[in-house]
């Protein structure tokens, strides 16, 4: 009987061990990240409705990935509080409510107003330049987005985030800025909800202009009060139009 050599394993009907080599970890991680980003966008932009069930099989077909990849992406979204999971009930998109929006807004006000106060009092010339440049980019989008929120919201959202981050960038607390980044992302679904109704209810462009001017004037008291009103205005729009309970 002839002994089979290692090379003979690759011939005939036998499959090479090399053919069954595992997928590189980097590729697996990038696929999970891509699925996470697509899922997140579908949730935040409302294609997967708040409170709706997220069936693994449906998501596998939707994103053309394995069940394991879907579960990993969903776990990341659970950590981001955009998805909830319960025993025997599977995964669901985290519901939206007026109480949740109020809670997020109140927490954001408490942290962001203090971070803004520190920045206004301590910011240097580089901070001023960042505030001015980020405001300029945002102002170019403010009025256009109010006229066409559906198509321009993603651009406006990034510019709006850049402006708010610029305002508090001279705050010395890295933890405060980190928590505010989380809160800002959590409120994105609510900002999208109110964007469709802002035009008759408020002038967001004027609110941003007033924030910029008071920040550059180093008027910490006025600037923080304007920020509080700016954040609370979104709640007023939701209540005015009965968008949430």
Curated annotation (Swiss-Prot):
GO molecular function, one term: DNA-binding transcription factor activity
KW DNA-binding (keyword) present: yes
InterPro entries (alphabetical): GntR_C (IPR011711), TF_FadR/GntR_C (IPR008920), Tscrpt_reg_HTH_GntR (IPR000524), WH-like_DNA-bd_sf (IPR036388), WH_DNA-bd_sf (IPR036390)
Protein name: Uncharacterized HTH-type transcriptional regulator BphR
Boundaries of every HTH gntR-type domain copy: 29-96
DNA-binding feature ranges: 56-75
Keyword set, alphabetical order: DNA-binding, Transcription, Transcription regulation
Protein's UniProt keywords contain Transcription: yes
Lineage start: Bacteria, Pseudomonadati, Pseudomonadota, Betaproteobacteria, Burkholderiales
SUPFAM superfamilies: GntR ligand-binding domain-like, Winged helix' DNA-binding domain
Any coiled-coil regions, as ranges: none
Gene: bphR
Organism the protein comes from: Paraburkholderia xenovorans (strain LB400)
Pfam families according to UniProt: FCD (PF07729), GntR (PF00392)
């Amino acid at each position: 009987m002839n002994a089979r050599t290692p090379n003979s394993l690759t011939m005939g009907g036998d499959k090479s061990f090399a053919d069954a080599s595992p997928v590189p970890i980097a590729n697996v991680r990038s696929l999970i990240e891509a699925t996470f980003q697509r899922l997140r966008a579908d949730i935040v932009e409302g294609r997967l409705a708040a409170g709706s069930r997220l069936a693994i099989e449906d998501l596998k077909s939707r994103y053309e990935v394995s069940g394991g990849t879907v579960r990993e992406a969903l776990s990341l979204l659970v950590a981001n509080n955009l998805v909830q999971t319960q025993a025997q009930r599977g995964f669901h998109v985290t519901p939206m409510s007026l109480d949740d929006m109020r809670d997020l807004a109140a927490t954001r006000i408490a942290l962001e107003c203090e971070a803004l106060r520190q920045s206004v009092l301590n910011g240097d010339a580089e901070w001023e330049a960042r505030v001015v440049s980020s405001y300029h980019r945002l102002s170019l989008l403010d009025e256009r987005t109010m006229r066409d929120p559906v198509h321009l919201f993603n651009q406006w959202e990034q510019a709006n985030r850049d402006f708010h981050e610029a305002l508090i960038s001279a705050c010395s607390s890295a933890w405060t800025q980190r928590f505010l980044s989380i809160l800002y992302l959590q409120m994105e679904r609510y900002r999208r909800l109110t964007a469709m109704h802002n035009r008759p209810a408020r002038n967001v462009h004027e609110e941003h202009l007033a924030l910029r001017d008071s920040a550059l004037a180093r008027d910490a008291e006025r600037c923080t009060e304007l920020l509080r009103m700016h954040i609370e205005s979104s709640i007023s729009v939701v209540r005015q139009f009965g968008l949430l309970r």
